[in-house]
């Protein structure tokens, strides 16, 4: 099998390392680009959300690189993500692509089906080899998330933001040529060392902004037009409310009870939203309140057009903003989103928060 998977931020790094440790040939999709989105938009139903369209673009670009198997997680609940594999398989079939799609559905969708699909990936490896590969993959997920947050912190204080750009660009370029989880971990360690050596201005007192909303648009830089970088260039310290590590700890490592961190967000959201609405709608509301309690200066909700769970959360956040006296901005993205207008809104929001801080200090 030549396995590929859709992009979701840095998840592809851990997925690549895990599959290579199991002896598979991995076809990493090209980094998401305008071309990826155009391909996906061309063949996807018009009203499907942007992540769906980017996924289709990822698949087609990977198939053209030689991939014959697609690995994707499933879902359940009101979010349409759970229907992705079915619809996407039909689209690829109609386009004449003969590929096998392996879906890791939630345990609640059927343990036998999940076991069958997992066994396809495990490649008849021994329990010891599987444990070792899984442990390395988990370490990769955590370390890539930590590296991403470190780059956000350094960028907010850096004397020259380009220094951070060069280090991170070099890191992503080297990933394609690096094989195996252990080598990828070494690359991450060296990149961390380089970031910590970037000259910083300790006198900067950056604004702190939380990024909340739909998980794909939070995590995938192309989908959110590199919002972390844009805010960092404005001397803003950014933190994401959802990362692959947070998702994994809540839905897998702490199953079926959930992680303490995410359950706390559910508790905070209860006064506004008692029941889950699909996706991460309830977490979005809870995260806004959580960031307020931690002394953040504001939050930005980001979601793809037509995302049902986040539309519900968006309507509630207006009340949260008023009740908590806490700046909240919502950004909706799709294939028509223009970067100039997007950046203008970010700059205006940051100016607003800066004036608010100055007024409080004064």
Feature-to-residue mapping (PLM):
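An N-terminal assembly and electron-transfer interface module characteristic of large anaerobic redox
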Residues: 1-362
